[in-house]
Amino acid sequence: MTVRIAINGFGRIGRNVVRALYESGRRAEITVVAINELADAAGMAHLLKYDTSHGRFAWEVRHEREQLFVGDDVIRILHERTLADLPWRELGVDIVLDCTGVYGNREHGEAHIAAGAKKVLFSHPGSNDLDATVVFGVNQNQLRAEHRIVSNASCTTNCIIPVIKLLDDAYGIESGTVTTIHSAMNDQQVIDAYHSDLRRTRAASQSIIPVDTKLAAGITRIFPQFNDRFEAIAVRVPTINVTAIDLSVTVKKPVKASEVNQLLQKAAQGAFHGIVDYTESPLVSIDFNHDPHSAIVDGTQTRVSGAHLIKTLVWCDNEWGFANRMLDTTLAMAAVGFRLDASASTKL
């Protein structure tokens, strides 16, 4: 069965989802039937074809009126501001990938379903009242047909959760801290300008800028046992893509750095293949651009202090890796089937 999807919001994640769909060879499994975006069709086509981070798209892209052509495929373009006006029922949409970054609570998800979609996948953590939050590779097997409104968590949550699980399963995590070293994003300023966050009034290309993060909450949403045992901070740096995460955890069992690396390398080659990668090459952030993994462990940076404090450095392409996980989760949601009785919903 080919899953019929619509994309709401054609920004960084929305466009990368389309690119990843074609580049990963999963077009036979997923069809994009419509994209809803307030920008005009010419701009949508241009930014899909040409991308500063990811280069030129290999497929032919063109537009005619309100249709986007990717190769031989025709995708309907919509410009609806109100979720209730979206024609998902008319288009036979199975799953909406809401990539706006604006919508993300149960009411928004129900609006997509009322418009005719069978399920909704948000491209950010969303509110606590959703049916499920999925970090693919860790908990997607808990999805059920009645989980209709789902979050794909965040790029940084997808990056760090697999590593936390591996370390906890092996050594028993007592507590931890996380520092996200994140590329600049489009909620920052090119030159100094007004913003409600005074640090983000400053030019993104000229400073390392501390920002708020909900990553600790994202960790405990997946692993409730770590409530009040993880803290996180984040800084934005003057690069346009790729993120590094500094993870420090205290563990119950004594361990050596070489043992930590052996564990993570084995997982990358085995149970977490395709989700986690491992390297000991002397690489820098740009070398991970366009990497489809959720997490790439840099074994050269692993440290252990006092046998119980582990520090690791984990890289991710915060756009491309996450876009690939959106596709993975979409297929997982479709694989468990569609149960349309809203009263049967049970929270994951």
UniProtKB/Swiss-Prot annotation:
Keywords: Cytoplasm, NAD, Oxidoreductase, Pyridoxine biosynthesis. It is found in: Cytoplasm. Pathway: Cofactor biosynthesis; pyridoxine 5'-phosphate biosynthesis; pyridoxine 5'-phosphate from D-erythrose 4-phosphate: step 1/5. Substrate binds at residues 154-156, 200, 213-214, 236. Pfam families: Gp_dh_C, Gp_dh_N. The keyword Phosphoprotein does not apply. It comes from the Bacteria. One of its GO terms (cellular component) is cytoplasm. NAD(+) binds at residues 12-13, 81, 318. GO terms for biological process: glucose metabolic process; pyridoxal phosphate biosynthetic process; pyridoxine biosynthetic process. One of its GO terms (molecular function) is erythrose-4-phosphate dehydrogenase activity. Its EC number is 1.2.1.72. InterPro entries: E4P_DH_bac, GlycerAld/Erythrose_P_DH, GlycerAld_3-P_DH_AS, GlycerAld_3-P_DH_cat, GlycerAld_3-P_DH_NAD(P)-bd, Glyceraldehyde-3-P_DH_1, NAD(P)-bd_dom_sf. The record marks 182 as: Activates thiol group during catalysis. Catalyzes the NAD-dependent conversion of D-erythrose 4-phosphate to 4-phosphoerythronate. Homotetramer. Belongs to the glyceraldehyde-3-phosphate dehydrogenase family. Epd subfamily. This is D-erythrose-4-phosphate dehydrogenase. It comes from Salmonella schwarzengrund (strain CVM19633). The gene is epd.
